[in-house]
């Protein structure tokens, strides 16, 4: 571990929901939930206002609606999120050549490698400037953690949320970690946490007191050694600029459990086709085919088959997935299916296992038939044209966003990022004056080229509560405020 807190972890605050609030003035300060809106949908992100009601990521959407019935429920706009993420990553790469993205809204940065930080004061200044730059460029807020290791930097950014900065100064790690829950440490999920709790271990300090031998006895050699090292704040993992893709997969959750075995098989074939398209799009091939099945009782089964060599052949992957399905009992119904490929390699013309063209045609036929059947089960085209939260433009009323649609009608609120909360109007779903539109920028450029957050004067739009804590450091002194 380093002797200076020069590893930075950035985590954007409620990213998807904050983007929606920044682009929709009427939702600022309101509960917003982004995710799949069907009966089997899952929450992708909840704004801080929604979290007050107990809504959180990965929660079933039905449960979220019961907890926060008056929240705004929106369909994700991934192209917009990705474009904003790219601007944030550009700011990070300006700090250092060693940037390790973890997702669209999260990354590690090695500040020392970029020469912008070498001790606590310089690291803190870099963190403060980064947060200000993110506000100026995107209009959003992010939380920053600084420490001598990746593990601690991530823990620090979590403590900084929302819209804060936390520095864990070298020498203070053990004292800081000691009283924290064992669940704070990476790799300690509900099962491991319960196992440790039954052994009387609930805090990080109690892990240290139990000793390495006891942890190995409880958790096994690899997990026990690793967890003990983390409890001692030992983490020498470097920031890696390019994270290697380990697998490619697709999965679907179904609004109604699938009971018919033939339908399950056709779904698996369709998912295999989608997986191949994604695999080829990335220029990859793989040798291990993985099938994921979540049953009616939420139990999840995973089956895999390793081939003799890498392939991107759709027939091979379909047939392997079908063989894997043969070993799974789907009695009672299936709520989720997934097909993936791991053991990846660069694209290869490998066709050792390719089947005859006639066999491919037979295999592809049912997929096409199922696609037609599935289309009949989907919502009407008119309803699918207007997903909640997406941008539209009306020839008379201008730019707006969809509040909801159904029964042949679509309701639109007409407002832009730099306007006051707008008026609501309802149209027929086939209104010729209404069309889908591209998102508007969250930050306007002034005459001097500088960024200005719409509707917020010189300050950034922030969706977090007004009363925020000051950020803190391991030594308890010299803290920067969480609002630059």
How would you label these PLM feature ranges?
Residues 380-396:
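Short coil-to-beta transition motif at edge beta-strands of beta-rich domains
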Residues 398-405:
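Short beta-strand-centered aromatic/proline hotspots
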Residues 413-484:
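Intrinsically disordered, low-complexity linker and terminal regions at domain boundaries
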Residues 102-106, 147-150, 284-288, 334-336, ...:
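Short Gly/Ser/Thr- and Asp/Glu-enriched loop/turn motifs at secondary-structure junctions
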Residues 408-412:
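Short aromatic-glycine-enriched beta-strand elements
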Residues 1-225, 368-379, 387-388, 468, ...:
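Gly/Gly-Pro- and Ser/Thr-rich, intrinsically disordered tail segments characteristic of DNA damage-repair
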Residues 344-370, 437-452:
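Intrinsically disordered, low-complexity mixed-charge segments
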Residues 2, 184, 192-336, 341-349:
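DNA-contacting surface of Y-family translesion DNA polymerases
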């Amino acid at each position: 571990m380093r002797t200076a807190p020069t590893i930075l972890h950035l985590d954007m605050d409620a990213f998807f929901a904050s983007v929606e609030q920044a682009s929709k003035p009427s939702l600022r300060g309101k509960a917003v939930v982004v995710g799949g809106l069907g009966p089997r949908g899952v929450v992708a992100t909840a704004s801080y206002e929604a979290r007050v009601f107990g809504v959180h990521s990965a929660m079933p959407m039905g449960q979220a609606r019961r907890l926060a019935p008056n929240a705004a429920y929106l369909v994700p706009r991934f192209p917009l999120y990705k474009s904003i993420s790219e601007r944030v990553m550009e700011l990070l790469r300006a700090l250092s050549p060693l940037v390790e993205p973890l997702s669209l809204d999260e990354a590690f940065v090695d500040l020392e490698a970029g020469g912008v930080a070498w001790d606590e004061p310089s690291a803190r200044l870099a963190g403060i400037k980064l947060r200000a730059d993110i506000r100026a460029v995107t209009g959003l807020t992010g939380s920053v953690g600084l420490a001598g290791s990746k593990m601690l930097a991530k823990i620090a950014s979590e403590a900084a949320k929302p819209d804060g900065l936390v520095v864990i100064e070298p020498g203070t790690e053990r004292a800081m970690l000691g009283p924290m829950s064992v669940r704070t440490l990476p790799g300690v999920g509900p099962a491991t946490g319960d196992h440790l709790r039954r052994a009387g271990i609930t805090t990080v300090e109690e892990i240290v007191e139990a000793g390495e031998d006891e942890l190995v006895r409880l958790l096994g050699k690899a997990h026990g050694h690793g967890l003990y090292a983390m409890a001692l704040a030992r983490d020498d993992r470097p920031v890696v600029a390019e994270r290697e893709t380990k697998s490619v997969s697709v999965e679907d959750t179904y609004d109604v459990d699938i009971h018919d075995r033939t339908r399950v098989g056709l779904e698996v074939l369709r998912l295999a086709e989608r997986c191949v398209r994604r695999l080829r799009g990335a220029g990859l091939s793989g040798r291990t085919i993985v099938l994921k099945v979540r049953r009616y009782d939420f139990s999840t089964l995973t089956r895999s088959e390793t081939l003799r060599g890498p392939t991107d052949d759709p027939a091979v992957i379909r047939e392997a997935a079908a063989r894997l399905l043969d070993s799974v009992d789907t009695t009672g119904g299936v709520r989720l299916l997934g097909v993936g490929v791991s053991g990846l390699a660069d694209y290869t013309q490998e066709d050792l296992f390719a089947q005859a063209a006639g066999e491919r045609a037979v295999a592809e036929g049912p997929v096409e038939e199922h696609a037609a059947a599935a289309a009949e089960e989907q919502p009407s085209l008119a309803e699918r044209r207007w997903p909640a939260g997406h941008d539209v433009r009306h020839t008379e009323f201008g730019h707006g966003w969809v509040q909801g649609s159904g029964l042949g009608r679509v309701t639109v609120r007409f407002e832009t990022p730099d306007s006051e909360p707008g008026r609501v109007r309802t149209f027929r779903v086939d209104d010729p004056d209404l069309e889908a539109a591209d998102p508007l920028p969250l930050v306007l450029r002034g005459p001097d080229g500088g960024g200005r957050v719409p509707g917020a004067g010189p300050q950034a739009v922030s969706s977090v509560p007004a009363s925020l804590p000051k950020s803190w450091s391991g030594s308890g002194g010299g803290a920067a405020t969480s609002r630059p």
